[in-house]
């Protein structure tokens, strides 16, 4: 029975995260016989946000699709890149007038995969459209045009990610993989939902374990102690790639196996 192996990579944090991806992603693809890599890159640029340089480096290192989140708008010079490259997604529940696209159907080894990027509203940006409504509309519009979907739910609240995943899976919308991003903390709840979607609440990050969500400890501690603005500095040491590996069976396009990735250089 033929299957597809898909790797989903947690938020790539700054230059250290991108450099780690550049050194290791192609080897990981070969080692695990990966057919497709989707990575969240919304914090991959130097400083914050995402830019053409970091996105291009992630693609050159072996990623097929880059998802983002609420930081996608931090660099105006990136807007034209979004408009010209549909393999980089911004959240689909931003207004249609925004640059870029929130989903794309991509051919991977002869199979049509719908990649969709959704933004949570709890503790995030309540003015955006409900991701539940957005998901319904897109899945309905593209019904019959894809074999299965991979969804990035970029959200703060675990309850919102959990509920949206079960909503999508429960309606049998042909979702093969649903994962959460944003918190930079990998959860240990990877499992297969009732109708066959592989799910994890958060992939984690590609960033330093000896940090606060990828930022130098002393910087964040200072902010908590003083309540004053600080300049975020990305920690460069002890980088780990976190995410999941999923196996999708091509006879029914359901997830047959999901496991966490925690890769560090020796």
Please give the residue ranges for each predicted region:
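Acidic, metal/ion-coordinating pockets
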Residues: 1-266
